[in-house]
Amino acid sequence: MIHLTPYEQRMLDGEFGAAKQVALQKIIDYAQILGATELVPITKAHLCCGSTCEPSDFPDGNLDRPDILAMGYHDWQTKLKCPGLDPAAFNSFNETTYVMDDVHCCDTFQWQWTQQTKEFYENNRQILSDAADRGVMIGSTCAPYLAGWLPVMGEYFVTTESSNVLYSNSILGARGNGGGGNTTFCSAICGRAPKWGLHLPENRHGTHVFHVACDTKDKTDWDLLGAAVGRRLAPNAVPVICGDFERPDLIKLKSFFTALAVTSGCELCLIVGVSPEAQTYEMAMGGHEPAAEFTITNEILQ
C-alpha cells in the first residue's frame, strides 16, 4: 500500500488537473511494482524530449522514418497508455521541478552534417519548442550538470541518463535512481517518484573496494579506470575508489563516470576524499565489510 500525503491525495483526486492525476497514478503503479510504500518529492528532472529512433516506435523496422516523435506529451495514448486523455490537458511540468532535456537523436543545429533529413530536423525543433513552452530548459545534453542542472546534497532527482545519475549521486550527494523515459516523464509532471533504491540511506554505502595503483594524471587515465572498475562490478554494487590518485577535476570525473556507466549498471560510486558521502574510507563503507577488493594497476589498464 502506498501512503500518500494530503497534497498527493488531492492530486490523485484530480484537484490539480487531469495530467497530474494520470501521471501520479502511473507513479503509484510503478511504486507498487518496486515494493515502495511512499513517494519522494522530485525537484530536478532530466528527461528525453527530442525525436527518437527507438525500435519500438518503428513497427515496420524502418529506423530512418522521420515522422515519429518520442516525447510522451505528443503521444499520451500509446506511450503512457492513457486512452481518452486529451493531450491538451498537459500544458506544463510540475511547478517546483526544474526540468532539462537530455540529448536526442537529431542534431539541434547541424542536421546536414549528420546526414539527417530536414523534415526530421524540423520535427525535432518543433518538439523542443513545445517542451520549452511547457517549462523545459533546453540543454540537449547528457551532462546537464555542465549546464546549470545541479541537485544539491540530499535533493531527490530523476534522470534518463546513466552517467548523470552517477555524477549526481556520487559527486553532488543528491539522491536518485536511473529511470526510463515514461517514468521520468511522469515524475516531472507530478513532482513525485517512488522512494526506493538510492533514495534510501541504507543503500548508499560501499560494497566493493578498488585500490588505485595506476596513473591518474589525465582524462584518458580516468576513462580507462572507469572501464576497469565497471567490468569488475557485481549487479547493484557500490564501488569505493581509494588509494594514491590525483584529485580529479570535473572533466576527468565526467570521463570516469561515462566509462563506468557503459560497462556496468552502477549508479553510485564513492570516491574517498572527493564524494561528500566518502570523506574517509570508513565513512564510505558505513561500517560494512567489502564484498570484494581489487587493485587497479597500469598493467590492467593496458
Predicted regions located by residue number:
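Non-transmembrane, aqueous-exposed alpha-helical and coiled segments at domain scale
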Residues: 1-302
